[in-house]
Design a protein with these regions (language model features):
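Cytosolic nucleotide-utilizing catalytic cores of signal-transduction proteins
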Residues: 6, 10-252
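Signal-transmission linkers at sensory-effector interfaces
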Residues: 1-2
């Protein structure tokens, strides 16, 4: 177990990884991915045991922990198994353990790696996926590093740069100043790929009402969401604001 922990945390020299793996009869060149199950409350002995029994004590998968709130699974993949299987497995773990959506429980997984020395990278990716997932995909309980999209980019931006970007876009206004109605309208409009008719239908409002709201928004921000480029700028700005807010909560 200490070998796996040190491997995950990148505490081992390359030569040590292979020497110790050999001694412990751990195959070095097998496809693996790291999954992190994060529980809302501190994990108790039973949740760790449940995960272990879910995997049926298969000696090829390693289950461990490096902190109070998460359980780490280093999963070995069979030939032909891929991300779809990791996704299925993640949902199965949540279902089996009764960790359904009402608890703030998430599973994230990193990319599939081919060598033992790469396992720490998959672990770092799964960690990042958990964070990025909390900021941008709060409603998802399974998060894949490979599907973080633009959220992963934003997550790596320094806060001063974010503040500068928001100031340039909104000048003295902040997206937080928009009322609930405006924010719902914007979300729906993006959801429907900037389609005015479809958005107004889903919001149960007249097309002209939606056009009026978009015009009003354009007046206050200088951005016309019907124009693709402006819509992208606005979408990224909203995501940047969410990221900044999340980072603020961590500081307190």
């Amino acid at each position: 177990d200490s070998f796996i922990k040190n491997l995950l945390l990148d505490n081992l020299l390359l030569v040590d990884i292979y020497n110790r793996a050999k001694k412990l009869h751990i195959d070095a060149d097998v496809r693996r991915a790291v999954m992190i199950l994060e529980l809302q409350q501190e994990k108790d002995h039973s949740s760790m045991e449940s995960v272990k029994s879910f995997f049926g004590g298969k000696s090829k998968d390693f289950i461990t922990a490096v902190d109070e709130k998460s359980i780490i699974i280093v999963k070995e993949l069979e030939e032909g198994e891929g991300y779809a299987d990791l996704d299925k497995l993640s949902h199965a773990i949540l279902d089996t353990l009764g960790l359904n959506q009402n608890e703030e429980t998430h599973i994230a997984y990193g990319t599939i790696v081919n060598e033992l020395k790469e396992v720490s990278r998959s672990y770092k990716e799964a960690r990042m996926a958990l964070d990025v997932g909390k900021i941008f995909f709060g409603e998802k309980d399974v998060i894949a590093y490979s599907s973080l999209g633009i959220g992963r980019l934003i997550y790596q931006l320094p806060i001063p740069l974010c503040k500068m970007f928001i100031k340039e876009i909104f000048e003295n206004k902040s997206p937080d100043d928009f009322d609930e109605e405006t924010l719902v309208t914007i979300d729906k409009f993006f959801e429907n790929s900037l389609n005015v008719s479809e958005t107004s239908r889903q919001l149960y409002i007249h097309r002209n009402t939606l056009v009026y709201r978009l015009d009003k928004l354009q007046k206050s921000t200088g951005l016309d969401l019907r124009v693709f480029e402006d819509a992208i700028t606005f979408k990224i700005a909203l995501m940047v604001v969410r990221y900044m807010k999340y980072m603020e909560t961590l500081e307190y």
